[in-house]
Amino acid sequence: MASSTKSVVIHAPVEKVQEYLADPMHLPEIWPSLIEVKDVQMLPNGGYSNRWMYKMAGMRLEGTSEVIERIPKERSVSKTKGAIESTQTWTFEPQGEDTKVTFSVDYTVPIPVLGRLAEAAIVKLNDREGDAIVENLKTIVEAT
């Protein structure tokens, strides 16, 4: 299993940041390899489930995602299933008028699809993508 953790401080209140991330339709705006989010459905816990399409190493991978935990002003945890199995955690820490956002993901690289030789390269690319995700989030939330 691979993992990555990235943090960024956003000049916005926790509520604004968490509200933006709560809508899975926003994720392709900040996540470069996330091609599509569809079939979004509200869950009783205040989160959502959805289907997604993701591009990894030039291949299109599909699956589902579901928010399994949502604590206002604190964190949101999602599980993905399908071509990529993962647990994604967003944590939110107020810092005066700003919010420190940390994005952690634990995931399985789909070895049968991509091959063992590609695994190290994929992990490195995904780690860089984590930087882009939090920086894109900062740019969009601060601009709105």
Predicted regions and their residues:
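An N-terminal domain-start capping segment
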Residues: 1-12, 55-60, 130-133
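Hydrophobic ligand-binding cavity/cleft-lining segments
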Residues: 1-44
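Intrinsic-disorder/low-complexity, polar/charged segments enriched in Ser/Thr/Lys/Arg/Asp/Glu/Gln
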Residues: 3-9, 47-49, 62, 75, ...
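Generic structural detector for well-ordered beta-strands
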Residues: 7-11, 53, 66, 79, ...
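Glycine-rich portal/gate segments that line the openings of hydrophobic small-molecule binding cavities
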Residues: 29, 38-84, 132-144
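Beta-strand/loop substructures that line and gate deep hydrophobic ligand-binding cavities in soluble
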Residues: 79-131
